[in-house]
């Protein structure tokens, strides 16, 4: 199966520990015989300027995308269509990776893995302004075909945002 992983968390030369768990997950999928490609949407703070890379043996295309720069989010969205072409599945990781798909979903089946514990108890641990913003962003959790999480508790909290509680 050809899978394109789209993530905002992935190791760079500038930040080698960032998203190492996503890289390991991707490498394990490749070891199981899947054709894995990675698109890393890199914020300015971790972007090392390398656009084509290999991490843990995986081909990586790195696009600049800072959430505070809407033009970069839109540019990333435009490039994602071509970068995911030919994939059997698009697999996004983390809520921030949903933003480029706010205006249009991928053409392929879409799996999303959520890592953000900020959604716990509908953002109860966040300040009021952050909680309000999170509620808007979390509506994007309804868009993927399938959403999985990194823990049972996170799955329970996320069910409130999914159309049928799945």
PLM segments and residue spans:
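Membrane-proximal helix-turn-helix segments that form the acceptor-binding/catalytic region
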Residues: 118, 128-147, 161
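A short, charged, and often flexible helix/loop element on the N-terminal side
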Residues: 54-81, 121-129
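Alpha-helix capping/helix-boundary segments
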Residues: 96-97, 153-155
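Proline-centered loop/turn at the N-terminus of a beta-strand
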Residues: 109-111, 146
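Short His-centered aromatic/hydrophobic patch
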Residues: 92-98, 114
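N-terminal subdomain of nucleotide-sugar transferases
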Residues: 1-47, 54-59, 85, 146
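Hydrophobic anchor at the start of a short beta-strand
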Residues: 36, 110, 165-166
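Helix-loop-beta element that forms the nucleotide-linked donor phosphate-binding surface
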Residues: 104-105, 143, 155-166
């Amino acid at each position: 199966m050809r899978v394109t992983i789209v993530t905002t968390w992935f190791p760079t030369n500038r930040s080698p520990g960032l998203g190492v768990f996503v890289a390991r997950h991707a490498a394990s999928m490749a070891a199981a015989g899947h054709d894995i490609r990675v698109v890393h949407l890199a914020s300015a703070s971790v972007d090392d300027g390398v656009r084509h890379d290999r991490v843990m043996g995986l081909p990586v295309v790195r696009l600049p995308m800072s959430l505070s720069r809407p033009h970069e989010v839109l540019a990333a969205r435009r490039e994602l269509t071509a970068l995911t072409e030919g994939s059997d599945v698009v697999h996004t990781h983390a809520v921030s990776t949903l933003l480029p798909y706010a205006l249009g979903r991928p053409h392929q089946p879409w799996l999303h893995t959520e890592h953000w514990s900020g959604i716990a108890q509908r953002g109860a641990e966040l300040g009021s302004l952050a909680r309000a913003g999170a509620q808007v962003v979390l509506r994007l959790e309804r868009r993927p075909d399938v959403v999985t999480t990194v823990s049972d508790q996170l799955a329970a909290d996320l069910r409130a945002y999914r159309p049928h509680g799945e």
